[in-house]
């Protein structure tokens, strides 16, 4: 019975405006967007929610979300992994979470063509991508974070690294729009893509039970064409529940 109800819901059209309105209701006066009322905020999901606001037509609210990012950025270009009501809840500095501001900034520009606001966000985008690239290893992968004690955690995550590729592409697109060149970002992107394509052993394989590790190299634009189709086909039966969708975690 539960499965039938779930499938029925999946056949309904998504009301984008209603979804964006719910995000706007959760947003705090500061611009911060937590997971849900009275819960934590992380920089990646905050930016994702800001893009949802833009898609739903809540452009002023989206701007407030990006201004919150600009205001809370650390001097080294990072953000902390979690905040609660404006206070730091987790001092881990995550490379992927920090880089994602580039995706949000470019998304807002593509929807509004507001070059002035893009220019306003540019310093934050620059510092964020430099922070992430400073965690790149000689082999191309990017270490996932700096711990609250200030130590680099030399573990690389495939999903996070794939997301960073998208962030770097968006950062390069912003740079081009504003008349800047960033050869270090181009080189870092190429090295990271090469690691994802050709050095899977550089990434934490224990995460392979998560569907994100399956599809993120495609979603991030690293694998395309026949390579993408092969990857999708290889684990389709493992992660896809026909008629329902993709399971988040596969436990045999």
Which sequence ranges carry the predicted segments?
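Low-complexity, Ser/Thr/Pro/Gly-enriched N-terminal "stalk/linker" regions
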Residues: 1-44, 55-79, 132-133
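Helix-terminus loop motifs that line ligand-binding clefts
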Residues: 57-129, 133-136
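Residue signature of alpha-solenoid helical repeat architecture, marking inter-repeat boundaries
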Residues: 40, 44, 96-99, 155, ...
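Well-ordered alpha-helical scaffold segments within catalytic/enzyme domains
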Residues: 1-9, 47-61, 100-117, 162-180, ...
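Detector for glycine-centered tight turns/loop "hinges" at secondary-structure junctions
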Residues: 30-32, 76-79, 86, 139-141, ...
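Glycine-/proline-rich flexible loop or hinge segments
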Residues: 33-34, 46-51, 66, 79-89, ...
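Structural signature of alpha-solenoid helical repeat scaffolds
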Residues: 10-11, 37, 41, 93, ...
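Extended ligand-binding clefts on enzyme/binding-domain cores
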Residues: 120-166, 175-251
């Amino acid at each position: 019975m539960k499965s039938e109800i779930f499938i029925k819901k999946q056949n309904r059209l998504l009301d984008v405006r209603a979804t964006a309105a719910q995000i706007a209701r959760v947003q705090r006066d500061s611009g911060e967007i937590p997971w849900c009322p009275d819960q934590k905020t992380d920089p990646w999901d905050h930016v994702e929610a800001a893009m949802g606001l833009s898609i739903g037509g809540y452009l002023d609210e989206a701007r407030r979300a990006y201004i919150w990012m600009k205001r809370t950025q650390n001097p080294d270009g990072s953000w902390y992994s979690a905040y609660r009501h404006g206070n730091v809840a987790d001092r881990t500095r995550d490379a992927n979470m920090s880089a994602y501001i580039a995706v949000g900034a470019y998304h807002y520009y593509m929807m509004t063509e507001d070059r002035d606001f893009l220019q306003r966000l540019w310093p934050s985008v620059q510092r964020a991508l430099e922070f992430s690239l400073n965690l790149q290893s000689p082999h191309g992968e990017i270490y996932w974070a700096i711990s609250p004690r200030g130590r680099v955690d030399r573990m690389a995550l495939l999903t996070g690294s794939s997301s960073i590729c998208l962030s770097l592409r968006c950062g390069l697109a912003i740079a081009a729009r504003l008349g800047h060149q960033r050869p270090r970002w181009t080189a870092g992107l190429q090295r990271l893509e090469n690691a994802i394509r050709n050095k899977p052993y550089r990434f934490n394989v224990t995460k392979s039970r998560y569907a994100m590790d399956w599809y993120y190299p495609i979603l991030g634009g690293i694998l395309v064409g026949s390579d993408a189709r092969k990857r999708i086909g290889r684990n389709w039966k493992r992660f896809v529940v026909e008629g329902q969708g993709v399971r988040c975690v596969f436990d045999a």
